[in-house]
From Swiss-Prot:
Pfam families: MFS_1 (PF07690). This is Major facilitator superfamily domain-containing protein 4A. It is found in: Membrane. It is a multi-pass membrane protein. Belongs to the major facilitator superfamily. The chain crosses the membrane at residues 19-39, 53-73, 82-102, 107-127, 139-159, 218-238, 303-323, 345-365, 380-400, 401-421, 434-454, 462-482. It comes from Mus musculus. GO terms for cellular component: membrane. CDD domains: MFS_MFSD4A. InterPro entries: MFS, MFS_trans_sf. GO terms for molecular function: transmembrane transporter activity. Keywords: Membrane, Transmembrane, Transmembrane helix, Transport.
Length: 510
């Protein structure tokens, strides 16, 4: 009860900034889940093949990674953080509004890349602001933060579903030339008196444009409007902190940073919260600053191994989450399942719905179960679910059941891993950036890889990839447990020294 009372008091003192950071991740969730169910409509809009449209996923995840790495530049002060969040959330609304006007896959990839930069900035800055405020009590608030990601990702496919086209303007899983020729013949037979052969990427633009403007465009514009209150909330927080005027910014930044430290209770066992005062840059470095050699002086080998294996686990799990959300719709509408487009459109919503449910469940569970145990259950559950999906690959009902199960197990992996590594290494910004970057690389690479394999080998390879990635995640997690066991317990010594006002220059930064 004492712990719960302390957390409640921390939340009461920081209610508005906490709610703002949670709402910012709602924008992140909206933007991360809309591509999957709208994939075929965007293919029609841009007249592209599956490998070509996969570059849109790649551009989003690549720029999300770059945004995550560069987000450290904007988290040095409260003003920079809030202005970065305001700009990023506003950009997401603008991207939603512009997507219907992108009729070339390269233009669409560029616009989605801009959204990826905004998402990456949100990912790093919002995570770090919550860790900065709540520090050792941040696990609970990180779970809620990622619950809002799931909430936005659940809403996005639900908004898109009524506007999805029931007809597929591309035949499933053919070569690019055959696809283009068949599509051109069918479209011309509907809209023109005669047909003519078409080479790759020379399909007439009018029919797909009409379909997109009359249907999917409305979904994107609705999402743009739904997202608008989020940048307004950030702007209101800027106003409350009196950071809207340049003249008042500098003195009030110190006040805001001191307020974040004052929210920590004065108990003796929590003196580790004073660490930022003794290491002023450790919680405020970007990815490039983290890689400097001086930050690792005196670090044991297990320190690097824990970073690498934890990042690899998130590489696999976040990559699987992104790939499954992106391609489960395309998998369902192809043989052998051949589910109708409207019914298949519910699969991404179901997936993100159970991710949201799992993150909601993990909020109270995280206060009673160790993060390491939660990650173990999640990874094992993912492997078992993919194996069952592979065994019952011809069963439509089990595809829906497996999708729900997969969302449940993947839901809390990222925040639990973040909390677990914090327990091991006393994470403060630098290591958080490493984990966020690893997860971003996974989403970028695995989505692109699955798209290429899906096109080359057929729909069955989609589940085979899931089994392989799940097994690799389990192997990397076992290695993480091993390196945790052999890692020297330096954190307690460092905490005691700092409680006495003594700095140890030989200790590595965390």
């Amino acid at each position: 009860m004492g712990c719960d009372g302390r957390v409640s008091e921390l939340l009461r003192r920081n209610l508005q900034p906490t709610l703002t950071y949670w709402s910012v991740f709602f924008s992140f969730g909206l933007c991360i889940a809309f591509l999957g169910p709208t994939l075929l409509d965007l293919r029609c809009q841009t007249h592209s093949s599956l490998p070509q449209i996969s570059w849109v996923f790649f551009s989003q995840q690549l720029c999300l990674l770059l945004g995550s790495a560069l987000g450290g530049v904007f988290k040095r002060t409260l003003a920079q953080s809030l202005w970065a969040l305001f700009t990023s959330t506003l950009v997401i609304s603008l991207v939603f509004a512009v997507i219907p006007f992108c009729h070339d896959v390269k233009v669409l990839a560029s616009v989605i890349a801009l959204a990826g930069l905004a998402m990456g900035c949100i990912d790093t800055v919002a995570n770090m602001q919550l860790v900065r405020i709540y520090q050792k009590d941040s696990a609970f608030f990180l779970q809620v933060l990622h619950f809002f990601v799931g909430l936005g990702a659940l809403l996005s496919p639900l908004i898109a579903d009524p506007f999805l086209s029931e007809a597929n303007c591309f035949p499933a899983n053919n070569t690019a030339n055959a696809t283009s020729r068949s599509h051109g013949s069918r479209v011309l037979s509907q809209h023109h008196a005669a047909a003519q052969p078409w080479i790759n990427q020379t399909i007439p633009r009018l029919p797909p444009k009409e379909v997109t403007e009359n249907h999917v465009s409305y979904a994107f514009w609705i999402m743009a409007l739904i997202n608008l209150p989020v940048p307004l909330a950030v702007l209101f927080l800027l106003s409350k902190e009196r950071l809207l005027t340049c003249a008042q910014r500098k003195p009030l930044l110190l006040s805001a940073d001191e307020l974040a430290l004052e929210t920590r209770p004065a108990e003796k066992e929590d003196t580790s919260s004073l660490a930022p005062k003794f290491q002023p840059h450790s919680g405020q470095e970007d990815l490039f600053s983290c890689c400097q050699r001086k930050n690792f002086r005196g670090a044991p080998c297990s320190f690097f191994a824990i970073h690498i294996t934890a990042a690899l686990v998130l590489f696999m799990t976040d990559g699987m989450m992104g790939a499954y959300s992106a391609f489960v719709y395309s998998y369902a509408v192809e043989k052998p399942l051949s589910i109708g487009h409207k019914s298949a459109g519910y699969l991404p919503s179901l997936f993100w719905g159970f991710i949201t449910l799992g993150r909601f469940i993990s909020i109270p569970v995280s206060s009673r179960m160790r993060p390491a145990t939660m990650v173990f259950i999640n990874v094992v559950g993912v492997v078992v679910t993919f194996l069952m999906l592979l065994i019952f690959s011809y069963n439509v009902i089990f595809l829906f059941v497996g999708t729900a199960s997969l969302g449940l197990f993947l839901s809390s992996t990222f925040p639990s891993m973040l909390a677990y590594t914090e327990d091991i290494l006393q994470y403060k910004g630098c290591a958080t950036t490493v984990l966020v970057t690893g997860a971003g690389i996974g989403e970028m690479v695995l989505q692109m890889l699955v798209g290429l394999i899906f096109q080359a080998q057929g729909s069955y390879s989609f589940l085979v990839c899931g089994v392989i990635f799940g097994c690799l995640a389990f192997i990397f997690y076992i290695l993480l447990l091993f390196f945790h066991r052999i890692h020297p317990e330096l954190s307690s010594v460092l905490t005691q020294d700092k409680a006495l006002g003594v700095e140890n220059p030989e200790c590595y930064q965390r």
